[in-house]
Amino acid sequence: MDKMTRERLIAYRSNKAEILELEYVLENRWKSDTMIGNDVVFDYSKGYPMPQTVVGFDQKKYERLQERDLNRKKWLEKECEEIEEFVEGIPDSITRRIFRIYFIDGRKPVKQKDVAKKVHMDQSSISRKIDDYLKTA
């Protein structure tokens, strides 16, 4: 596990959203018109080569894109799991709650003053607890 940084923690929500987007793409890519490709084959039915265009599903492109997106999704899931384990591994209850509320819970970013209200502290204490814990972690 790499060193936990504020940037990795902040990226958590975006990573979760990207995982959902990748799941949708992985399941629906085959329906897309972008998977239709064309190729040229030579028709020898008249005794000499005549180029003919063949239109169809581009299987190689589909497999390449699916593999790329699947690998990206696996990496993002691993990253999110590491962040969740890091936050759950924080021994102090207040600090753990601050990290969970500020970095993990919900779909939209939360302001430190909102976290402060939830844990009954002032905003500067929230910022200080986050910075202090990340320095020692």
Model-identified regions with their sequence ranges:
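Short amphipathic alpha helix immediately N-terminal
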Residues: 92-105
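C-terminal flanking helix
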Residues: 134-137
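Short alpha-helical "recognition helix" segments of helix-turn-helix
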Residues: 111-119
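N-terminal interaction/assembly modules
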Residues: 1-86
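Key DNA-contacting residues within the recognition helix of helix-turn-helix
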Residues: 127-131
